[in-house]
Amino acid sequence: PIGDIVLATNSNRTIADFLATGHYETRPSIRTLASAMDVGAPSNMERLRHLFPDFGSLRTAVECYPVHDQAIRFQIAKDYSRFGRLWCPHTATGFWVYDNLPESRRLDKAWIVVATAHPAKFNNIVQGIVNLQEIEIPPPLASLLELPVQFESLGTELEAFGEALARWDN
């Protein structure tokens, strides 16, 4: 039921390079505006290779394009100006790739661009790009941010993790 699968990534272009060359090589992560994509050794590569054991079928089914920080900034500003909508940096990568597909391809079918997070989660980035004093936080997110922070520091031993899980389960 799904047509084209077009992925967007940031300057950490491990998957884009793999799909372009067929050669998978991990590398150090590069820090970018789209921080959740700052991965030089993507953990989902094993899943991707399992779903598509034949590289040719993977390359036919999936495309991936890297989007650099300058393009992320441009897309956030452009779409805010055009539509009055704000994107988080991750969502902006998807819209940048979509906007840069050939027009005939974009108009040929319906597309879905997957949004990752609310821009308020990245207000320190987005506010400066669109010159806003404040990004309105939606009530559900605001209520989560008001909850007390709870965490427990654990040692690096597996036993410490098991003990913490046992305490949490009770």
Label the predicted regions:
Residues 1-170:
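PLP-dependent amino-acid enzyme catalytic core
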